[in-house]
């Protein structure tokens, strides 16, 4: 593989990190006390031209953990009227995270990346809930970096002058259905599309690959 082609790989593009897009729906803003109710993850892949695309999607409704706080306003906002309804088909936090991490590890290994990194819109929020769930479930092997993220709110503010997901997507020329918003599945898919669009646009403008140092050649 030539130096130029080597640069057009997921491993090279993100310094060995494997980007995974995540969105959570919750019963409040406090990751320590409020329930995690829904989670979705979308992995990414890079084609032979160095363009980034969504790859696999995994999604779960999640049962509130024992003693979890449920804020009425949060439930009204995300449309989850009864978190305990059997019709949700919810699983435990541990079941959801283990299945998500199994997929991430498999695709991370295939991409020859050393660690996963979370991509999310206002990523600190999503990462805080995932980290809190990891602690509650006493999960030792967590693929995500504990604090580093790619935040599409920041990136879209730079690229499109918009930080709200719906407005950023529309400014980027994407379709966005406000009736579907605040579903972890829909929001993750749109965040993945937005992130890929920003990365690919930067490449098209000549921002990547970087000019290789002579020593690296």
UniProtKB/Swiss-Prot annotation:
Entry note: cofactor: Binds two Mg(2+) per subunit. The active form of the enzyme binds two Mg(2+) ions in its active site. The first Mg(2+) forms only one salt bridge with the protein.
GO BP term, example: tRNA processing
Site (Important for substrate binding and specificity): 29, 77, 125, 147
Chain positions recorded as Mg(2+) 1 binding sites: 23
An example Gene Ontology molecular-function term: RNA exonuclease activity, producing 5'-phosphomonoesters
Enzymatic class: hydrolase
EC number: 3.1.13.-
Keyword set includes tRNA processing: yes
Requisite cofactors: Mg(2+)
Keywords of the record: Exonuclease, Hydrolase, Magnesium, Metal-binding, Nuclease, tRNA processing
Assembly behavior: Homodimer.
HAMAP family the record matches: RNase_T
Name of protein: Ribonuclease T
Species: Vibrio vulnificus (strain CMCP6)
């Amino acid at each position: 593989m030539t130096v130029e082609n080597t640069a057009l790989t997921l491993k090279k593009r993100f310094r060995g990190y494997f980007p995974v897009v995540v969105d959570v729906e919750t019963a409040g803003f406090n990751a320590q006390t409020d329930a995690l109710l829904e989670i979705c993850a979308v992995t990414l892949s890079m084609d032979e031209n160095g363009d980034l695309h969504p790859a696999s999607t995994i999604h779960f409704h999640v049962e509130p953990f024992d003693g979890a706080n449920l804020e009425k306003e949060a439930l009204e906002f995300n449309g989850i009227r009864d978190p305990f309804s059997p019709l949700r088909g919810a699983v435990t936090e541990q079941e959801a995270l283990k299945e998500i991490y199994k997929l991430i590890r498999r695709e991370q290994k295939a991409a020859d990346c050393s660690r996963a990194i979370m991509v999310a819109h206002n990523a600190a929020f999503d990462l805080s809930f995932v980290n809190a769930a990891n602690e509650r479930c006493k999960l030792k092997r967590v693929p995500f970096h504990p604090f580093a993220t790619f935040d599409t709110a920041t990136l879209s503010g730079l690229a499109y002058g918009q930080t709200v997901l719906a407005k950023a997507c529309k400014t980027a020329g994407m379709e966005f259905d406000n009736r579907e918003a605040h579903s972890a599945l829909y929001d993750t898919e749109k965040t993945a599309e937005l992130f890929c669009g920003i990365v690919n646009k930067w490449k098209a403008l000549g921002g990547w690959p970087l000019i290789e140092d002579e020593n690296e050649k």
